[in-house]
A protein has these predicted regions:
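Class I SAM-dependent methyltransferase Rossmann-like catalytic core
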Residues: 2-36
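Class I SAM-dependent methyltransferase SAM/SAH-binding core
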Residues: 51-107
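A short SAM/SAH-binding and catalytic strip from SAM-dependent methyltransferases
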Residues: 116-129
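A short acidic, Gly/Pro-enriched loop at the edge of an enzyme's catalytic core
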Residues: 106-117
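Conserved alpha-helix/loop element of class I SAM-dependent methyltransferases that forms part
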Residues: 29-49, 65
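Conserved catalytic/acceptor-binding region of the Class I
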Residues: 142-203, 211-222
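A short glycine-rich, Lys/Arg-flanked "PGG" loop and its adjoining helix->strand segment in the class I
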Residues: 131-143
Length: 226
């Protein structure tokens, strides 16, 4: 399945999130909330992870939480944006096992069956080809490894479809089918509803641009203000 984000090249996405790196942490409420929820889902797991990838790590908040949860593991912060990785690097303490790797999620520079956990918070809307990304995840996962991910669904931000990238958000059934095609077994998917109230429409747009969900304020909105 090719997502609408395929209209943006990897370079386009890299540049967008390079720009957003400076403002991401002030505009990342959704990203932060889904990250926390995804970590909660991992609490019942009782495996010793030696190698973990935070795939699409953004500014590295999730990476640091993973390194605290799995203290013996080598955690890699993987993102297409060099500026996001620089921000992630500044978070880590001295002598940290965390390493930063700049890479496209559809072309991972890791050996087959070398990773215990792939953690991907809000990555899937930004991959050009869902199947290729899931195939790569399955390739690098060890037997009995875990792929934990969160993504927005097609009904997300439905009030703002005229200017948001909601067409990027994969349907849960498409993701489930993709996981099976990639060779992953026993996929478990569920849906959470997150309701957010912004102080103003301007603040909403500022957050969308600030976290990279939008490249810039929509031109038609600017035109209406003038």
């Amino acid at each position: 399945m090719r997502l609408k984000s395929g209209e943006l090249s990897v370079g386009d996405i890299q540049r967008r999130f390079d720009r957003a790196a400076a403002t991401f942490d002030e505009s990342d409420y959704v990203h932060r909330t889904t990250c926390t929820g995804l970590l909660e889902r991992l609490k019942p797991t009782t495996f010793d992870a030696a190698v973990i990838i935070d795939l699409g790590s953004a500014s590295g908040k999730g990476t640091m939480l993973l390194s605290k949860k799995y203290r013996k593991a080598r955690v890699m912060s993987v993102d297409v944006s060099a500026e996001m990785l620089r921000k992630s690097s500044r978070r880590k303490p001295l002598l940290s096992k965390v390493r930063e790797v700049q890479a496209d999620a559809c072309r991972l520079p890791f050996l087959d069956h070398s990773v215990d956990l792939v953690f991907a918070n809000m990555l899937l809307p930004w991959v050009a080809t869902l199947d290729q990304c899931l195939n790569e995840v399955n390739r690098v996962l060890r037997k009995d490894g875990i792929f934990a991910f969160a993504t927005l669904g097609p009904d997300s931000m439905s009030e703002f479809t005229s200017f948001t990238d909601s067409q990027r958000y994969p349907d849960m059934h498409d993701v489930g089918d993709g996981l099976v095609r990639a060779g992953m077994t026993d996929p478990v998917l569920d849906v959470d509803r997150l309701q957010i109230t912004w102080k103003s429409f301007d603040k909403l747009l500022d957050d969308f641009v600030g976290c990279g969900a939008l490249g810039e304020w929509p031109s038609d909105v600017r035109a209406e203000e003038q």
